[in-house]
């Protein structure tokens, strides 16, 4: 992430302000049975907590998984109902879709955290969602696990090297990311654990 980006877009949370050795793992696009259960099992090994930015339609398909996420002490958060691209969606449709996902989430546990799919959201959409009480969460590190052409070892090396206290890291618990995720996540968590880091869910101000 370019260092100037958070300064330009101050309405978003890019990392958590802390000097403690804590990493904030986030998982986008689930729940999806195989990758999500793998993630939950891996988190359990490290007594780690995480934040799951879920697509509402996937929650409705896999309600038992959404409940498992909550039962294991993690956070369910909003990633729109249908994984919309903010730049290509009308203002009203985007806000309605986000609110529809929120209604689904509130059947389990209310969180004010929201991440726009692809990180794409307009100023007007941002203004409306923040006025409605959403906290817009971006990231300072991304795994690129969704890209099946990446050099996994090189991507891991960069991810580990650039991790800092308070980093918000993006993985994906999706079928598309599965081949890369199942290799990268355990190795990343082991490396950071060896450096003395713990893993927590993103705190909400609500």
Task: Kindly give the residue locations of the regions a language model identified.
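CE4/NodB-like, metal-dependent polysaccharide N-deacetylase domain
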Residues: 40-49, 75, 84, 91-123, ...
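Hydrophobic faces of well-ordered beta-strands that scaffold small-molecule active sites
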Residues: 23-27, 50-52, 76-79, 112-114, ...
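N-terminal pre-catalytic segment of deacetylase/amide-hydrolase enzymes
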Residues: 1-26, 31-47, 61-64, 186-206
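Catalytic grooves of carbohydrate-active enzymes
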Residues: 163-176, 180-203
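Charged helix-capping and loop-helix junction motifs
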Residues: 67, 91-98, 150-157, 182-186
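Acidic-and-aromatic substrate-binding clefts and catalytic sites of carbohydrate-active enzymes
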Residues: 30-34, 53-62, 84-92, 115-122, ...
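His/Asp/Glu-enriched short active-site or ligand-binding loop at hydrolase and phosphoryl-transfer sites
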Residues: 120, 126-161, 196-206
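A short, conserved beta-to-alpha structural element at the edge of catalytic cores
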Residues: 45-72
